[in-house]
């Protein structure tokens, strides 16, 4: 049986399609910045795709493929029971109670940006796809850390696949981005490489394949890799996927020329610089303890009620105040949620190690700027002929 459908409009819940940015700023100011940052970046990515001349169809297809495949993945994993392990904060524009408008834009960003950036390298198909996965993870990682810290979403408290975390971000989340984006890129690249003109048939085939197969092939990779950590994502599995992907990329790099920028790539270079600078600035300028997230969360109820999935993994069905370990609290509310509540308010917690979190986000930001500027031709004086 499926979990409650993510597209269920849930009239019994106090959600709104539109919320005043001023009202949201009072509760979660950093989230308002993050929401409109991603919407703006996705719009810039579309403008970039549209300005690609004879390569317009290829780039616009990449944009829409990322939007559709990414959103489909999100909906699938919200719908599946005992995979359903994350809940988004209420944004100023909501599509459903669980899906803010900005989330499809997030998928566009961490899938379109690395896909087209790696196209400039002219790598062979498999190394090209795996480098796209690594670059996608680099784009996503600082957002994964900042968003969790400032309660832009909440995680299931006892779900084994997301239990192992680095700076508050599940290792499983990092591995998912690497494998999902790499799979998406491989499928998309193989389809468009066979039809550079990108006919209508190619568009339909590419959209169908990336939407239908990316998540499935990602799950196959994840299932194999996480056996290194006893069946759940962990440090060994993360190191293994990084090493395998990096080795394949290195083997193909010798056959690739230096990245060649295309007209219009300057907008992507500027966008990544703004993005990778904005997230460290959010860490510096805002206090997570002042953030209040009233939204859907893990259902509140009795402690230690077990639920078991088809793989045999167990987790506690409910969140309970007496025994949970998440980066939020109930300190700002007058009373705890009623048993069975799926909509309630949680309060951000102060930094426990601000220097570590800051170093992680700033380091990823600096590395991200360097990698993307290199891939997009921003670190070379002679740009040569336009790339793909």
Where are these regions (language model features)?
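Aromatic-rich, lipid-facing transmembrane alpha helices and their immediate juxtamembrane interface loops
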Residues: 1-388
